[in-house]
Structure formats: structure tokens, C-alpha cells
Regions:
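A conserved beta-strand-loop-helix scaffold within acyl/acetyltransferase catalytic domains
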Residues: 9-10, 21-22, 28-38
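A short, internal acetyl-CoA/4′-phosphopantetheine-binding micro-motif in the GNAT/acyltransferase core
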Residues: 44-51
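C-terminal structural segments of small proteins and small subunits
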Residues: 62-97
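Conserved acetyl-CoA-binding loop-helix of GNAT-fold acetyltransferases
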Residues: 52-65
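Active-site rim helix/loop that mediates acceptor-substrate recognition in acyltransferases
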Residues: 1-13
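STAS-typified acidic loop motif
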Residues: 15-21
Length: 97
């Protein structure tokens, strides 16, 4: 399965979508607080037929990459994103616990 990510940034918010060759698999929605150098992950959603395949984790990893590129700290308001990040190593540079 060929997966692609698209970042749909609009002002201080947006979402990252994950797609295969045919359709959207899920998305991570975020808000940027530029004055605080933070990226807030609002929620991570994966369509039911793709659940249990690690797609949500891939979205969180892409959010981490986006945050690192911009030198932002992530505040995960989404409980799923927070639980994934708590299990990850080497993200202290971007994770506000």
C-alpha cells in the first residue's frame, strides 16, 4: 500500500491527511500557537476500515516530524496522540508532558 501525507495548513490551524492510492485513511487535526512555539494536536481520526493497522500512529509520527521542522513543542489534547507519544522514545525535544 502506497501511503501519502498532505498537510492542509490554514492560518494557525489545519490537518494532516493520510491517503492511499484510492482514498483518505485518516487525519490529524492541529492548532498552532506561534507566540508559544506550540502545536496542539486536537484529534487523530482513522476511518473504521483502517483501524488496528497502525495508521493513527503514522499520523502522530507525521505530526512530530512537522513539529520538529518548525521547532515547535507538541501539546497533545487528543488522548490517543498522548498515549502514543508516551510510549515513544527520543521525542523529548517536541513533547510537552
Amino acid at each position: 500500500m502506497n501511503l501519502t501525507f498532505e498537510n492542509h495548513k490554514n492560518g494557525n490551524g489545519g490537518f494532516i491527511s493520510l491517503k492511499n492510492e484510492i482514498e483518505e485513511i485518516g487525519r490529524l487535526t492541529y492548532t498552532i500557537q506561534p507566540e508559544k512555539n506550540t502545536l496542539i494536536i486536537s484529534y487523530v481520526m482513522v476511518f473504521p476500515k483502517f483501524e488496528g493497522q497502525g495508521m493513527g500512529k503514522k499520523l502522530v509520527e507525521k505530526g512530530i516530524e512537522f513539529s520538529r521542522e518548525n521547532q515547535w513543542i507538541i501539546i497533545p489534547h487528543c488522548s490517543y496522540a498522548r498515549s502514543v507519544m508516551l510510549r515513544m522514545k527520543d521525542i523529548e525535544d517536541v513533547f510537552a508532558q
